[in-house]
Structures are given as C-alpha cells and as structure tokens.
C-alpha cells in the first residue's frame, strides 16, 4: 500500500543548522526522529524533566497535527520518555519544536547534542461538531459505561 505524502515547510534555527532534519529511520517507519539541539550536554536526573530544543520550526498544514512521541529504545533501555505523550503540535503553532523529556529510571542520563530524543508524526485531524442532546444514545454496546480495566487483563 502506498502512503500518502504531504509537504511540510521546515526551517532550521541558528542553533540547529548543523543537525539533521527529522527523518524516517526505515522505509516503513511511522515517525521521524527528532534531534537534541542543546549547546552543551545535559544530565537528566531521576524524575527530573527537561524541555529540549530541536532547532527547528515547522508549518504544519491546516487539517493536520504533529504528534511527538517517545523513542521506544530510550524508554525501554533508559526510562527516558516524553512527559506529555503524545505531545500535540497544532497547525497554527510557529515556534520552535521542543520536547519535554522525563527520566523515569533511577539512574542519571546524559543527553548530548544531536541525540535522537523523540519522534514526530504528522497526522490528519478532524474537527468535531458536537451534537448536544438531552436524550443520549441508548443503544447497547457490549461495553456500555465500563471503563478502566473493564475489558480484562
């Protein structure tokens, strides 16, 4: 199946000019890696969070959003994840893309300039029009109001 492609404007800021643009690691990758545009290395201690610059600004087209997600290897091997995962970048945002990382391990972790720290997906979004009703859908769904843990282990 052929994936659709969209053009997204991107600009490297002065502190990110030497870094790679976000890119797919493999042909079938869903997300593109984002790089740390830190001037100096930073140590992320256990349970600390850090807003890491990427050195880029992007112009996401209307009808799309950017989703910032953790890199699975960083999370599994080092406990480093994106705090507000997935982070949402709205199509009208024009500031620098920054990543809010947190260290959930019990060991300090050093983030160096150029490290791949997260991934970004550009995805279509719908805009909701609420249908406010006094009588709510009474149709049985099998789940109904069952919430957390209701579908079993």
Curated annotation (Swiss-Prot):
Q: Which cofactors must be present for this protein to function?
A: Mg(2+)
Entry's EC annotation = 3.6.1.23
Which Gene3D superfamilies did the record assign? 2.70.40.10
- InterPro entries assigned: dUTPase, dUTPase-like, dUTPase-like_sf, dUTPase_trimeric
Amino acids binding substrate = 71-73, 84, 88-90, 98
Which EC class is the enzyme in? hydrolase
Could you provide one GO biological process annotation from this protein's UniProt record?
dUTP catabolic process
Q: In which pathway does it act?
A: Pyrimidine metabolism; dUMP biosynthesis; dUMP from dCTP (dUTP route): step 2/2
Q: Which reaction does it catalyse?
A: dUTP + H2O = dUMP + diphosphate + H(+)
An example of a GO molecular function for this protein is: magnesium ion binding
SUPFAM superfamilies reported in the protein's UniProt record:
dUTPase-like
- UniProt entry keywords in alphabetical sequence: Hydrolase, Magnesium, Metal-binding, Nucleotide metabolism
What family is it from? Belongs to the dUTPase family.
Query: What function does the entry list?
Result: This enzyme is involved in nucleotide metabolism: it produces dUMP, the immediate precursor of thymidine nucleotides and it decreases the intracellular concentration of dUTP so that uracil cannot be incorporated into DNA.
| Name of the protein this chain belongs to | Deoxyuridine 5'-triphosphate nucleotidohydrolase
Give the species.
Answer: Wolbachia sp. subsp. Drosophila simulans (strain wRi)
């Amino acid at each position: 199946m052929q994936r659709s492609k969209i053009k997204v404007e991107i600009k490297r800021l002065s502190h990110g000019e030497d870094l790679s643009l976000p890119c797919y690691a493999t042909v079938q990758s869903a997300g593109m890696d984002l790089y740390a545009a830190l001037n100096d290395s930073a140590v992320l201690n256990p349970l600390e969070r850090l807003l890491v610059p990427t050195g880029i600004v992007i112009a996401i087209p209307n009808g799309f959003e950017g989703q910032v997600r953790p890199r699975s290897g960083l999370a599994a091997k080092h406990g480093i994840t994106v705090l507000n995962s997935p982070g949402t970048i709205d199509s009208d945002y024009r500031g620098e893309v920054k990543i809010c990382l947190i260290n959930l391990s019990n060991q300090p972790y050093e983030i160096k300039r150029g490290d791949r720290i997260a991934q970004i997906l550009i995805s279509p979004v719908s805009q909701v029009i609420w249908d406010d009703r006094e009588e709510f859908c009474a149709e049985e769904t099998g789940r109904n109001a069952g919430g957390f843990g209701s579908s079993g282990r």
